[in-house]
């Protein structure tokens, strides 16, 4: 190992006996920061300790925190694809037709309302899109989503979803964590904490990022008070995909030599620290990053997909954002095939300010729908054709809906009182509609659901009892659903 020996000679070394085995060990008298600075290691290169653990006779003390765990219940789904439609899709323009809006378009609203964000509240505003009953189930879907109509019988449309807040950051964070205040783990982190992942080469919680940053920031995919292993890992749908992951060394041999040095540092630090979850988590993350160096290029190599498959997902579409979201959906399917537990897709920021159309509703919503309609329908069909839909739970939702009356002349304000979302796949009763808003589409009046209910049912379908998934924090056993959440049998096949 001439390269490794050369690196070792850069640092003063001393001998001492291991307090566990009594054997003489070599100790590098240098800080980890010094090693990293001197050897120019990136995060990915740091990760090869696992390579040498396999060569060692000594048993590893570092259990994989992402290893699969037994569910509480019989699972209906193994993976989740969470499609976050940032900004607020209008329920009365997508999945909740309201004939009275058309009949009374332009008239003063005949019902009381709560305060809106901008208080520029106009008259009733009819949808510019027509609805059509689709599939054998007859679920009404508007002209916004012509491709999604073809999979209507796979969807369970919930028309009675509610939100905690009318503000983007609070509502977005509540959707992701069950709470409107920062510091809580994301639902993806909870799922990975509860079940681990079936993938050895990828994190359990992956975000395929379209570019639109979350309102409220990265805490929406964070691990909160859970160990950092469970936070979401961001991937991009185009190069460089995973920044700073690829090996920077001129050869694999140089990287291997560096890892032999760092392995001694890791083991010495771990032995000195004793049982330390922070250190063990860091080492486990390094090991995962090393494995990803080999696995990630294959994941993102879409040349392995057939031309018809790429066309169905919209990778040849005229609209750039359709191509981008289509790539995200295709990567999501490939992550499911590789055993990743929780996958979130975010949207592209170039779609007329997300789904947040306070003005020019018709053009803004049309562009947003054009970006996602074809890819989402293709993903559902592709998963079904491959026998994966029954084990993959798909959730598509915004943080809240929009008002059935105008903001200004041609927009809609935020509405947390009642809105639509849908689920499909693993354990979901397809071809159904659950809940209802009032005759104008403003407020949920039948079978109202909260984010706690949504999370409880997501966990249930994955085989997790939401009342038993807890983590000790602040002197109490905390759970994703707090003291709330109910299982809705009507949603479940």
Predicted stretch roles:
Residues 2-493:
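Ligand-binding pockets and gating/stacking loops
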């Amino acid at each position: 190992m001439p390269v490794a020996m050369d690196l070792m000679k850069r640092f003063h070394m001393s001998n001492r006996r291991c307090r566990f085995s009594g054997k003489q060990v070599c100790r590098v008298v240098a800080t980890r920061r010094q090693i990293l600075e001197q050897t120019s290691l990136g995060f990915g290169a740091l990760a090869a300790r696992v390579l040498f653990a396999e060569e060692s006779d000594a048993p590893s003390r570092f259990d994989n925190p992402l290893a699969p765990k037994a569910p509480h219940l019989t699972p209906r789904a193994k993976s989740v694809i969470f499609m976050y439609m940032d900004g607020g899709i209008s329920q009365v323009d997508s999945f909740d037709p309201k004939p009275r809006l058309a009949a009374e378009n332009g008239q003063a609203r005949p019902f009381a309302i709560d305060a809106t964000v901008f208080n520029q509240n106009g008259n009733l505003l009819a949808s510019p899109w027509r609805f059509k009953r689709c599939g054998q189930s007859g679920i009404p879907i508007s002209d916004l989503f012509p491709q999604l109509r073809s999979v209507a019988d796979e969807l369970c449309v919930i028309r009675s979803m509610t939100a905690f807040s009318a503000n983007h950051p609070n509502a977005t964070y509540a959707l992701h964590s069950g709470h409107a205040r920062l510091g809580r783990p994301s639902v993806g982190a909870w799922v990975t904490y509860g079940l681990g992942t079936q993938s050895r080469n990828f994190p359990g919680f992956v975000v395929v990022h379209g570019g639109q940053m979350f309102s409220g920031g990265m805490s929406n995919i964070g691990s909160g008070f859970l160990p950092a292993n469970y936070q979401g890992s961001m991937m991009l749908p185009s190069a460089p995909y995973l920044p700073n992951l690829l090996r920077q060394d001129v050869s694999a041999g140089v990287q291997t030599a560096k890892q032999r040095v760092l392995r001694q540092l890791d083991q010495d630090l771990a032995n000195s620290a004793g049982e330390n979850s922070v250190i063990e988590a860091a080492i486990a993350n390094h090991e995962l990053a090393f494995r990803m160096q080999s696995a990630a290029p294959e994941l993102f190599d879409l040349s392995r997909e057939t031309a018809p498959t790429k066309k169905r997902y919209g990778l040849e579409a005229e609209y750039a954002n359709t191509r981008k979201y289509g790539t995200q959906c295709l990567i999501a399917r490939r992550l499911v095939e590789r055993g990743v537990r929780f996958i979130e897709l975010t949207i592209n920021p170039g779609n007329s300010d997300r789904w947040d159309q306070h003005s020019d509703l018709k053009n803004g919503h049309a562009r947003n729908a054009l970006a996602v309609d074809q890819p989402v329908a293709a993903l559902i069909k592709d998963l079904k054709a491959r026998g994966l839909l029954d084990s993959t739970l798909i959730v598509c939702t915004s943080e809240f809906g929009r008002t059935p009356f105008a903001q200004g002349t041609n927009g809609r304000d935020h509405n947390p009182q009642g809105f639509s979302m849908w689920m499909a796949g693993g354990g979901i009763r397809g071809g159904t509609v659950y809940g209802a808003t009032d005759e104008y589409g403003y407020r949920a009046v039948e079978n109202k659901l909260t984010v706690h209910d949504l999370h409880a049912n997501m966990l249930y379908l994955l085989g997790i009892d939401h009342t038993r998934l807890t983590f000790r924090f602040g002197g109490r056993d905390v759970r994703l659903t707090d003291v709330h959440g109910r299982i809705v049998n009507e949603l479940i096949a």
